[in-house]
Curated annotation (Swiss-Prot):
GO molecular function: flavin reductase (NADH) activity; FMN binding; riboflavin reductase (NADPH) activity
One Pfam family matching this protein: Flavin_Reduct
Lineage: Bacteria, Thermotogati, Deinococcota, Deinococci, Thermales
Record protein name field: 4-hydroxyphenylacetate 3-monooxygenase, reductase component
Segments crossing the lipid bilayer: none
Keywords for the protein's UniProt record, in alphabetical order: Aromatic hydrocarbons catabolism, FAD, Flavoprotein, FMN, NAD, Oxidoreductase
Amino acid sequence: MKEAFKEALARFASGVTVVAARLGEEERGMTATAFMSLSLEPPLVALAVSERAKLLPVLEGAGAFTVSLLREGQEAVSEHFAGRPKEGIALEEGRVKGALAVLRCRLHALYPGGDHRIVVGLVEEVELGEEGPPLVYFQRGYRRLVWPS
């Protein structure tokens, strides 16, 4: 069942984000594809964070986090925050430079979700970057969107 479940989810395309939080001098970030818009009024987003993620206690303690929506070409950024470090990649003021958009959120709620926590954030600020194609993850790899001509 576990392998079939993973294979089924690999067939679902999703955008790629980097979620980050800072508590004192400690700043953590992680790549997340389990992210969604939850509500427009109030503006809420939700994401799933593993119980084992180093980000989780920082996010909980800070009571705030950012979500950077990655653009096509930011594969190395995604890999870096997925635990495969790349030289020269870092957060800038809690966000990924060059992202399509950055959402600055206050922690609204936390819910249990199996081996994950469901994190709900109240969006307090939106930074829009340059428009462009998003970074997409599908079938265990990064893909490009094809625009109709």
